[in-house]
């Protein structure tokens, strides 16, 4: 039960809404209202002249008309966390996660394919682990075994690029696309991007000719087009913008235009729909380390002490580290740890032949990973160590498997151009 109130401030401003209960993170000196437009607003108690109770409200039960029968092959929705499938009661401010396909049909304005929805886990994306990548991969495979035309994975955006890359390596071939989708704006905000992103992801899995791991999110800050990025070539580039996800060193594989309900494939180079062939194991003893000026070598040596089997370094420029950590890098390699190099610049590619420092790293046994993104390299290292013998891993890392690296850099794609 919640209270609807009128808050009168000392300066004469008046607000009406539902008073939200405090949480463990709330400031005890703040009163929070859920306004009619869906936004929350907070007031310091010292600014409030009067609070007038206007009545009580109850949580509205979830209801939706039964979805009509839809013909065709099913699309599976696998929920892993995040707010994209949450329903918000604008009266009480309560958030209700729902996997009801009837409700989905209603909020999306229809579905172009029959839907099955399941929950895999309920995790903040920062709590994802390589072990959970394996769990998600197994559930994706189960969906395909049940006849799914495609699988939509609902995922928090902060680490979506890691999971997308992991699934790209896990599935050598698949009967359909694996589309990861999320929302930058939670569904209790008028500017939410959840509905359009999900609608686009379902369209991709139902219609696309390719069968790859992709990220489906807004291409622009408006609602005119949604981009479909390769899972190994995408990165979250802004903390809050709707168009935060960008393809790096390449362009999106497809675009979805909601006004025309048009899915436009932008390349003829892709993995086609086929049989199911996957390996869902990932090694947890892998580290991703960013080099910085003044880095203490003990930080790298500590990775050996905790049993790391693989280390991906984000080096400067062409893929360099400071002279002071070279002995630590050599110590890791001499102990049998696989060490690979990516670049902090993201765009461009690692080249350890240009400067002496790069050649020193090569002579130690550091593996240059061309134009592979650091997060993608981390996922590939985890997958390779879990599924191949140690002596095979360097070859696997430098062999293109899921379009994660290219033979040349296209200057026209720098900065998303």
Swiss-Prot record:
CDD domains attached to this UniProt entry: GatD
Keyword Protein transport tagged: no
Keywords, alphabetical: ATP-binding, Ligase, Nucleotide-binding, Protein biosynthesis
Location of the active site: 83, 157, 158, 236
Native source organism of the sequence: Pyrobaculum aerophilum (strain ATCC 51768 / DSM 7523 / JCM 9630 / CIP 104966 / NBRC 100827 / IM2)
Protein biosynthesis as UniProt keyword: yes
Catalytic activity: L-glutamyl-tRNA(Gln) + L-glutamine + ATP + H2O = L-glutaminyl-tRNA(Gln) + L-glutamate + ADP + phosphate + H(+)
EC number of this enzyme: 6.3.5.-
Name of the molecule in the record: Glutamyl-tRNA(Gln) amidotransferase subunit D
Classification via SUPFAM superfamilies: GatD N-terminal domain-like (SSF141300), Glutaminase/Asparaginase (SSF53774)
Top-level EC class as recorded in UniProt: ligase
The protein's role, per its UniProt record: Allows the formation of correctly charged Gln-tRNA(Gln) through the transamidation of misacylated Glu-tRNA(Gln) in organisms which lack glutaminyl-tRNA synthetase. The reaction takes place in the presence of glutamine and ATP through an activated gamma-phospho-Glu-tRNA(Gln). The GatDE system is specific for glutamate and does not act on aspartate.
Entry GO MF terms: asparaginase activity; ATP binding; glutaminyl-tRNA synthase (glutamine-hydrolyzing) activity
Residue ranges constituting the Asparaginase/glutaminase domain according to the UniProt record: 73-400
Membership in a protein family: Belongs to the asparaginase 1 family. GatD subfamily.
Gene Ontology process terms (BP): amino acid metabolic process; regulation of translational fidelity; translation
Subunit structure: Heterodimer of GatD and GatE.
